[in-house]
Regions:
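Bacterial N-terminal signal peptides
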Residues: 16-27
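Eukaryotic scaffold repeat domains enriched in small/polar residues
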Residues: 29-340
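N-terminal secretory signal peptides that target proteins for export/translocation
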Residues: 1-12
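Sequence-pattern detector for short linear motifs
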Residues: 8-10, 18, 44-45, 223
Length: 340
């Protein structure tokens, strides 16, 4: 049979040698980092443990979501705290406070300054006015991320939805759904878990979906109406060691009957509103892609004291990167692409 040639001793030796050579290349590639980045300073020092998201509105005001106790803390452009929205009543409990955020996973701000919160604790999306009044809410089972769209719409992710993105209208009803789980495993439940992700948007109201657990870090661009476009994918030699380990873990869990559990790979990402560049965080590794999906640079990030910064949120600004971690808080980094 034709396949017998692969069973000869020489062929087996060749396959093993090739495999070892590729592994060596992967290991060499994994150590190739353009620069070590150290934060200039910590910002918004009152926020640390429970940090989930940071947003900025057109006026320069910042919104920091920390769960479960803080809610959404607002700051002016100079970093002075203004208010705390949706914080639970510590004396009477969250159940007695109708406007409380029980466990917010993500937030976003519309053009009127209204604050949208994906509240996994209440299984709903809550909408607050700029002064913190609860305007409305609608049910979503296990929301994990959201992004505000024009005309009162909001895109939401939930690992309990068959599609990756569900868009709700201003009345809280489903308008459209888009995105199917990636097919990595024969098991549908593993595919759905591995396709869990988070959302970001840009100035053109396009959506970016970042796959949290995908073996090869991936962010996919969608237009407002759910049509997929550019992929931002980390697939160089330096991406392979972790990808190989992740795929081996997938194979291992395929044999189990218990519900799948995986460690996050893409821990945060953000979009530059000026040019559409994408920045990915893989724990303390920072990747920069241009708007066409070409990787530009790779960095490792540290706090001013030299500790690894395991990023969980990032905000791209014209003159700096704000990168945050739970529980270390938020840090100000000089933009490495603007140094030269």
């Amino acid at each position: 049979m034709p396949e017998d040639r692969f069973r000869s001793p020489f062929a087996q030796f060749f396959r093993v040698a090739t495999g070892l050579f590729l592994v060596a290349l992967f290991c060499l590639g994994a150590s190739q980092v353009d620069e070590q980045l150290t934060a200039r300073r910590r910002v918004f020092p009152s926020i640390g443990a429970g940090l989930r998201a940071i947003r900025r509105d057109a006026s320069g005001k910042y919104y920091l979501l920390a769960s479960p106790s803080v809610g959404v803390a607002t700051f002016d452009s100079k970093g002075k705290q203004l208010a705390s929205i949706g914080a639970a009543d510590s004396t009477n409990g969250a159940a007695s406070n109708r406007s409380a955020i029980v466990f917010g996973e993500d937030c976003d701000i519309d053009s009127q300054g209204n604050i949208f919160v994906a509240d996994r604790g209440l299984n709903q999306v809550s909408v607050f006015s700029p002064d913190g009044k609860l305007l409305r809410s609608f049910p979503v089972s296990g929301p994990t991320s959201l992004a505000v769209l024009p005309e009162g719409e909001v895109a939401v992710t939930s690992n309990r939805s068959p599609h990756l993105i569900v868009v709700y209208g201003s009345n809280g009803k489903v308008v459209r759904e888009s995105g199917d789980p990636e097919e990595i495993s024969p098991r549908d439940d593993l595919n759905r878990y591995l396709s869990i992700g988070r959302l970001a948007s840009d100035s053109q109201n396009r959506l970016y979906y970042g796959f949290t657990y995908f073996p090869e870090p991936l962010v996919r661009l969608y237009d407002r109406f759910g049509y997929a476009g550019q992929d931002f994918r980390f697939t160089g030699l330096d991406a392979y060691p972790e990808a190989i380990a992740a795929r081996k873990e997938i194979e291992h869990q395929e044999k189990k009957i218990q519900p799948p559990v995986f460690k996050p790979i893409l821990t945060a990402f953000g979009v530059d509103p000026a040019n559409g560049d994408v920045w990915m965080c893989l724990h303390n590794t920072l990747l920069h892609f241009d708007k066409d999906g070409n990787r530009q640079s790779e960095y490792q990030i540290y706090t001013p004291s030299g500790a690894r910064l395991e990023a969980t949120t990032i905000l791209i600004e014209p003159d700096r990167l704000l990168i945050g971690s739970d529980p270390l808080g938020l840090f100000d980094f000089e933009r490495p692409d603007r140094k030269h």
